[in-house]
Swiss-Prot record:
Name by which UniProt lists this protein: Mannose-1-phosphate guanyltransferase
Record's GO cellular component terms: cytoplasm
Single Gene Ontology BP annotation: protein glycosylation
Keyword Nucleotidyltransferase: yes
Job of this protein: Involved in cell wall synthesis where it is required for glycosylation. Involved in cell cycle progression through cell-size checkpoint.
Localization (cell): Cytoplasm
Signal sequence extent: none
Family annotation (Gene3D superfamilies): Hexapeptide repeat proteins (2.160.10.10), Spore Coat Polysaccharide Biosynthesis Protein SpsA, Chain A (3.90.550.10)
EC number, as in UniProt: 2.7.7.13
Reactions accelerated catalytically: alpha-D-mannose 1-phosphate + GTP + H(+) = GDP-alpha-D-mannose + diphosphate
Keyword match Metal-binding: no
One GO MF term: GTP binding
Length: 364
């Protein structure tokens, strides 16, 4: 089987992290985001993966080469000379996606969930039509494009309603699809939208179905959602009693859902959790309080600091008795001085912060 991952452009929503690494290589749960998807696709029998990119493919080539060998898949880059939206990249990769009659997966690189690729392929094969969209239920459908089914048909899609004022349903597009190669005949090689142009055309012909996603789902393309997605991912691991989580018997674990790389060092009298990820070679000092945060590789949090709702970037340092909260994101190699308070915002790479940041801001 084949798959195309829509990687896209500059990852501006996840800055300042994407100023250092392309978004697919930013670690989520201590592994590059793209690796979660490659691993799940390979487990479902996918042998050819296309990454549709228009930004820094050179950086990704060497990183992804080892995944090819590890998971026995072929990973190719389809490089856009101009952004082609969400449908144009399928046409650009037509030689691979359309090389045989087997269906192919399409997914957005920002989506984290329990990927149901095997079940999705079986469902798609069973109904025999042109396309299937994975949908997920949300509490506030008025913020999204909602999927509406045909009367008396649980899976055949009738239409899409963008940000409905009145309730028409609570299922939204989860950014994961499976398509027959015939869909490529509907797409022109130009900037075009699969959601606004291709899907309505397939719908009109009664050829589009939905598949309900079980479990968690999150688009982690911006910092607040990255943190929310981390909480959902850790909760999912906890339900499965995953060995990736630190046991609750560890003296520093407070509230559970804590992931610590084996190479990290944790000081005395720390309270860590719930929902914390600590990356490779991270150093956490004595008496530190961590909650709902991610500490990326080689970062350091010094004694008695408080870090909550924060992403601490690679090689960054948080000073003694400092306090970070309210969706603060430190880029690569940022230094927060002792006793400094940061109340949200983004701090770009290689900055040193010696004064309080009382109002969320972008510090360049």
């Amino acid at each position: 089987m084949k798959a195309l991952i829509l990687v896209g452009g500059f990852g501006t929503r996840l800055r300042p992290l994407t100023l250092t690494l392309p978004k697919p290589l930013v670690e989520f749960g201590n592994r590059p985001m793209i690796l979660h998807q490659v691993e799940s696709l390979a487990a479902a029998g996918v042998t050819d993966i296309v990454l549709a990119v228009n930004y820094r493919p050179d950086v990704m080539v060497s990183a992804l080469k080892k995944y090819e060998e590890q998971y026995n898949v072929k990973i190719e880059f389809s490089v856009e000379s101009e952004p082609l939206g969400t449908a144009g990249p399928l046409k650009l990769a037509e030689k691979i996606l359309g090389k045989d009659d087997s269906p192919f997966f399409v997914l957005n690189s920002d989506v984290i969930c329990d990927y149901p690729f095997k079940e999705l392929a079986e469902f798609h094969k069973k109904h025999g039509d042109e396309g299937t969209i994975v949908v997920t239920k949300v509490d506030e459908p008025s913020k999204y494009g909602v999927v509406v089914h045909k009367p008396n048909h649980p899976s055949r899609i009738d239409r899409f309603v963008e940000k409905p004022v009145e309730f028409v349903g609570n299922r939204i597009n989860a950014g994961i699809y499976i398509m027959n190669p015939s869909v490529l005949n509907r797409i022109e090689l130009r900037p075009t939208s699969i959601e606004q142009e291709t899907f309505p055309a397939i719908c009109k012909d009664g050829q589009l179905h939905s598949f309900d996603l079980e479990g968690f789902w999150m688009d982690v393309g911006q910092p607040k959602d990255f943190l929310s997605g981390t909480c959902l991912y850790l909760t999912s691991l906890a339900k499965r009693n995953s060995k990736l989580l630190a046991p609750n018997s560890e003296p520093y674990v407070y509230g559970g859902n804590v992931m610590v790389d084996p190479s990290a060092k944790i000081g005395k009298n720390c309270r860590i959790g719930p929902n914390v990820v600590i990356g490779p070679n991270v150093v956490v000092g004595d008496g530190v309080r961590l909650q709902r945060c991610v500490l990326l590789e080689n970062s350091k949090v010094k004694d008695h600091a408080w870090v909550k709702s924060t992403i601490v970037g690679w090689n960054s340092s948080v000073g003694r008795w400092a306090r970070l909260e309210n969706v603060t994101v430190l880029g690569d190699d940022v230094t927060i001085a002792d006793e400094v308070y940061v109340n949200g915002g983004s701090i770009l790479p290689h900055k040193s912060i010696k004064q309080n940041v009382d109002v969320p801001a972008i510090i360049m």
